A protein has these predicted regions:
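N-terminal beta-strand motif that seeds the catalytic metal site of vicinal oxygen chelate
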Residues: 1-17, 70-73, 124
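A short, acidic/glycine-rich surface segment
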Residues: 38-39, 58-63, 96
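Hydrophobic side chains in well-ordered alpha-helices
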Residues: 16-19, 83-87
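Core segments of cupin and vicinal oxygen chelate
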Residues: 8-50
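Exposed loop/turn and edge beta-strand positions of beta-sandwich/beta-sheet ligand-binding modules
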Residues: 37, 69, 104
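Acetyl-CoA-dependent GNAT
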Residues: 55-59, 122-125
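Vicinal oxygen chelate
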Residues: 31, 42, 84-125
Length: 125
């Protein structure tokens, strides 16, 4: 069994697409408008799964994803310090890290435009 995709409800689809493409390097593979007021984009990582971003005009007016969501997304990186430098060069705020955890793995955290926590993990191998 493999994870096919992760769905995230977003406030602004275009802003979210740009973040996931420009900051995280995901590829925009498909967009659909299945019904009035709903827009969906699928983005993928070349090595793993797909992220589905959904903007719904009615939900966006009342739903505060940053307060109600328990979603976080983790990406494995080869070098946490290089990733932190890359993010800082793109003017992205590092909210925590680098943190070394028992076992030697290193972590750093940012947030996407919707308040979703993004974790970068350098595994100790």
């Amino acid at each position: 069994m493999n994870i096919k995709f992760i769905t995230i409800k977003v406030k602004n689809l275009e802003e979210s697409i740009n973040f996931y493409k420009e900051i995280l390097g995901l590829k925009d593979i498909r967009r659909i408008n299945p019904m009035g007021g709903t827009k969906i984009a699928f983005l993928e990582d070349k090595n793993s799964g797909t992220i589905e971003l959904i903007e719904n005009e009615e939900i966006s007016k009342t739903y505060d994803v940053s307060k109600e969501s328990m979603v976080s997304i983790g990406f494995e990186v080869k070098n946490i310090n290089e990733k932190i430098d890359e993010l800082k060069n793109k003017k992205i705020n590092i909210i925590r890290g680098p943190i070394e955890v028992p076992g030697g793995s290193k972590l750093a955290f940012i947030k996407d435009p919707n308040g979703i926590e993004i974790e970068f993990i350098e595994e100790n191998r």
